[in-house]
Amino acid sequence: MVVKVGINGFGRIGRIVFRNAVEHDDVEIVAVNDPFIETKYAAYMLKYDSTHGQFKGDIQHSSSNNLTVNNKTIHFYQERDPANIPWGKHGVDYVVESTGVFTTTEKAKAHLSGGAKKVIISAPSADAPMFVMGVNEKSYRPDISVLSNASCTTNCLAPLAKVIHDNFGIAEGLMTTIHSYTATQKTVDGPSHKDWRGGRTAAQNIIPSSTGAAKAVGKVIPALNGKLTGMAMRVPTANVSVVDLTCRTEKPVTYDQIKAAVKAASEGELKGILGYSEDALVSTDLNGDPRSSIFDASAGIALNDRFVKLISWYDNEWGYSRRVLDLIAYIAKVDAGK
């Protein structure tokens, strides 16, 4: 079952979702919309990427404002209003909303006017239900038309937190994500009225920042609601981030028991989502890793049998984008009654 998908917003995540779709047998991108990028430039940006390298395939653009990728036509539009994008004309059932602008149910559902059946927001949402693959996707219902794939950090933290809580219980915890810089940050110091630190040069500074990723885990794992919170440190790396979860467990546990539980989950029900490694990893080793969370067994520590620090890596671009497509493939099967 191949699902026809459209992408609104051909920025960082939009393009990485497209690249992942080429490797995803269940999903086919048939249309893209971005009002700020003309087709010729879109072809260039898709072909060349400073972080993930050159596109593995053939990309052409035509005078008819379409892209041809691996001999398949991708219809390209430049509509500012999502309601005007003719998704239905191309058989698009599911739209990836990756502009970062239309992140509420009310705004995102404008895509339905163009013929789309469902909208998947590739960002946290204030009101749309959030789903994290491997954690709560089974709570999806076919009557939901707008949903969120949460954030890259929530996708890293939630599977790990689920394993720890299911096996040993989490009484409370604090998370810090050491996060690569992103497009919202500055190349040189500049004005940022809501976040003064966020206006400082990304490539020169370690910048403390806020994140709702830990609290969002409480939305996808209700038993952890109110038990987790966290912050971010934006660091001068282009890609790959790492979660530090420091938590108090409800049951006494050794670090070896935690390692065994995570390893078992990574080889079982969370295979392909949660990884496990005892290698001496550094961030670039995870560039291009399609998993949501890669537990670093040799980096964590335990103070005692109820207080531990756990470390898990994630490619905040590639791994997250792969989950967007996995979520679409999953809900498509549910919608089809399979």
UniProtKB/Swiss-Prot annotation:
D-glyceraldehyde 3-phosphate binds at residues 151-153, 182, 211-212, 234. NAD(+) binds at residues 12-13, 34, 80, 316. It holds the Pfam family Gp_dh_N. One of its GO terms (molecular function) is NAD binding. PROSITE patterns: GAPDH. The keyword Ligase does not apply. Its EC number is 1.2.1.12. GO terms for cellular component: cytosol. Signal peptide: none annotated. It is found in: Cytoplasm. One of its GO terms (biological process) is glucose metabolic process. CDD domains: GAPDH_I_C, GAPDH_I_N. InterPro entries: GlycerAld/Erythrose_P_DH (IPR020831), GlycerAld_3-P_DH_AS (IPR020830), GlycerAld_3-P_DH_cat (IPR020829), GlycerAld_3-P_DH_NAD(P)-bd (IPR020828), Glyceraldehyde-3-P_DH_1 (IPR006424), NAD(P)-bd_dom_sf (IPR036291). It catalyses: D-glyceraldehyde 3-phosphate + phosphate + NAD(+) = (2R)-3-phospho-glyceroyl phosphate + NADH + H(+). Its main location: cytoplasm. The record marks 179 as: Activates thiol group during catalysis. Keywords: Cytoplasm, Glycolysis, NAD, Oxidoreductase. Induction: Preferentially expressed in yeast cells, the host parasitic phase. Induced during mycelium to yeast transition and negatively regulated during the yeast to mycelium transition. The active site is at 152 (nucleophile). Belongs to the glyceraldehyde-3-phosphate dehydrogenase family. Homotetramer. This is Glyceraldehyde-3-phosphate dehydrogenase. The gene is GPD.
